[in-house]
Amino acid sequence: MSFLLFITLGLSLTALSHCVQVTIQNPIINVTSGQNATLYCTYILNNQNKNNLVIQWNIFQAKSQNQETVFFYQNGQSLSGPSYKNRVTAAMSPGNATITISNMQSQDTGIYTCEVLNLPESSGQGKILLTVLVPPSVPHCSIRGAVETGHFISLLCYSEEGMPRPIYSWNRVENGLLKSTPSQMNQQKGSLIIGNLTDFEEGYYRCTASNNLGNATCELNLHTGGEGGVIAAAVIGGLLAAAIIIAIVWFLVVKRKQKKQLPPTKEMKTGGNQYMAVSGEANEPPKENLGASEPTETIQFHDHAENAANGETEEPTA
């Protein structure tokens, strides 16, 4: 048993002797947004031949959950990753792989890895958890529920930026003064629950998002007929617009159907194999044909009074 333990320890020491030793001075770093961050990393080589020396810094970003190269060095040449271009300064002295990153932003929060490789030795690495502290951004205030008397509603507040994570508080604004709200409030989620809305609860409300770097606020106007009235007006306006469009389409369809239902034009053959267009309605005889028709019989009557005076009678003549 002791013999096997001796062999195991011997193999472990042999492996360590052929591995680059990397030391991290500060494994946890907090830095304020906009400031510079220095990531200390030193190493010890067992093989003093540095022709195959490779130093690489990577980050696993907390926000995007992506891995990206921060800095790379090999054969006297160095380069920075796309997000860190012109932001990285490397020490590059013997045994020192320390880098300084300028103008830290919230997306720079993550786990940084310092890896040193010097073939034929195995690579060694160390990790740093870096957090960029950011004051809260201006929060977004919103209302959930119908803003009408007797309805159950809640107020919501959320900041997209902020590290440490902001806490939220709601207050009612009266004559420029902040009044506490007796309703249910969740400081972590930024929600304020108001049961059945009454006239007493109407007014202006302010949400404050804060952490140890600062605070930011937003306000909203809570009154019946406020946002609910705007939404109702928008819905009514949309319905009216839809009704107008439907009426126009219906009118055009009816007009098109009426045009299609008009009686077709008929053709009547006349002398000389010529055709003339006449309406499908009852036709009147052409005026020029009236003169060609036979004259009607005319009966003439003489004055009966004159004939009677003369004692004569006269038969009607054709």
From Swiss-Prot:
Cellular component GO terms, alphabetical: basolateral plasma membrane
InterPro entries xrefs: Ig-like_dom, Ig-like_dom_sf, Ig-like_fold, Ig_sub, Ig_sub2, Ig_V-set, VSIG1
Location(s) in or outside the cell: Membrane
Signal peptide range: 1-19
Residues in coiled coil: none
Keyword Metal-binding in annotation: no
GO term, biological process aspect, one: maintenance of gastrointestinal epithelium
Pfam families named among the record's database cross-references: Ig_3, V-set
Disulphide linkage map: 41-114, 157-207
Chief place where the protein resides: membrane
Segments of this protein annotated with the region Disordered: 261-318
Membrane topology: Single-pass type I membrane protein
Regions that span the bilayer: 234-254
Intervals, Extracellular compartment: 20-233
Ig-like V-type domain sequence ranges: 20-131
Tissue expression profile of the protein: Expressed in thymocytes.
Keywords: Disulfide bond, Immunoglobulin domain, Membrane, Repeat, Signal, Transmembrane, Transmembrane helix
Cytoplasmic-facing ranges: 255-318
Domain named Ig-like C2-type: residues: 136-223
PANTHER family: V-SET AND IMMUNOGLOBULIN DOMAIN-CONTAINING PROTEIN 1 (PTHR44974:SF1)
Identification of the protein by name: V-set and immunoglobulin domain-containing protein 1
Source organism per UniProt: Xenopus laevis (African clawed frog)
